[in-house]
Swiss-Prot record:
Catalyzed reactions: sn-glycerol 1-phosphate + NAD(+) = dihydroxyacetone phosphate + NADH + H(+); sn-glycerol 1-phosphate + NADP(+) = dihydroxyacetone phosphate + NADPH + H(+)
Cofactor note (record): Binds 1 zinc ion per subunit.
Residues annotated for NAD(+) binding in this entry: 94-98, 116-119, 125
Lineage, uppermost ranks: Archaea, Methanobacteriati, Methanobacteriota, Stenosarchaea group, Halobacteria
Origin: domain of life: Archaea
The encoding gene: egsA
Alphabetical list of PANTHER family matching this protein: GLYCEROL DEHYDROGENASE, GLYCEROL DEHYDROGENASE 1
Protein name per its UniProtKB record: Glycerol-1-phosphate dehydrogenase [NAD(P)+]
Amino acid sequence: MLKKTTWIKLPRNVLVGHDVIGDLAAAIEELYLDGRPLIVTSPTPDQLIGNRVRSQFADPQTVSVDHASFDAVEAVIDTAKATDAGYLIGLGGGKPIDTAKMASDRLGCGFVSVPTAASHDGIVSGRSSIPEGDTRHSVAADPPLAVVADTAVLAEAPWELTTAGCADIISNYTAVKDWQLAHRLQDVEYSEYAGALSQMTAEMLVDNSDAIKQGFEESAWLVAKALVSSGVAMSIAGSSRPASGAEHLISHQLDRLVPDAALHGHQVGVASIVTAYLHTGENGEWEDIRAALADVGAPTTATELGIDEEIFIQAITSAHAIRDRHTILGNGVSEAAAREAAVFTDVC
C-alpha cells in the first residue's frame, strides 16, 4: 500500500523582466496579504530602488541590515512586531533576502523576494544561509510567496555578482551527480523531476555561456530565469540536494579556513571543476564546466579566487566532515587524490 506523501511549497507569483519593479504591489495584491510591509534591505539597494518600492505601498516600514546573522534576524523580528508588519519584503542581495526569509518563517508571515543582484539561487529557494562565527548555517524556511526580479536592475549590478550567480547554477551539474550517487549507494530519496530540472538549468547556462556578457539586459534575463528554476527544483525536492553537493561542502570549508575570501558562487563554481573530475575522470564534464565559467568571466582557479592553493587542497580533503551528506567526497579524499584532481584541472 502506497504511503508516500509530498508537500511542495512554491512561489505563487514570479515576475522576471524589464521594469517589473513597478508591478510589485500588483503581484503582492494577488496574494491577499494583510497589513503593511516591512522592507528588509541594506544601504546600497535601498538607495538604488528603495523609494520605488516604498512609493507603491501605504505606510511601509524599512529596516536595514549590514550583515546576514542570527542577530540581524532577531532585529528584523523585533521591528516587525513593533511596527505591526503584516509581511516582509526582502530587497537586495543575499544578506537582506536570507535575513527576511528566515525572519518571516519565524514570524509565520508572508515573504516576498525582490533581488537587486542575480548572485545566487537563494532569491527563490526555501533555504537561508546564515553565518555564525566560522560556520555558515543552511536553514530551512518557506520559499517566498512572490519573486519580482527586474532585469534592468539586475543588469546594473556589479558584474562579479552576476558571474557568481552563473557559477552557482553551473555547479548544479555536480550537485545532481552527488544526489544520484547518494541515491544509489545510500538509498537517499531522489526526485527525477527535481534532478532533471536542476540539470537542465545548468545545461542552459553552459550552452549559452558565450552569450552572457556584461552590460546586456538579456544576460540578466538568462541568469535570473536559471536562478528561479534552480530554486524551484529545491522546493520540489524539499531539500537543497538539486543544487548543493560536494562543491558546496568545499565552499563551506573554505569559508571556515579563509572567511570572506571570495563570493559563494565563485567558490562553488571552481570547486565543481574538481568534483566533476572526481565524478567523471580526465575526459569528463569538468572541461565544459571550466570553459563555461571562463566564458562568463568567473574564476576557474584557486588563485583567481584569491585563495592559496594549499588551502584549497586542504578544503577538498576535509570538506566531507562539514555535514552528514554523502557525495563524491565519501569519507574523505586523500591529499594525493585532491592534489591530482586540482592540478590536472588547472584549479591549482
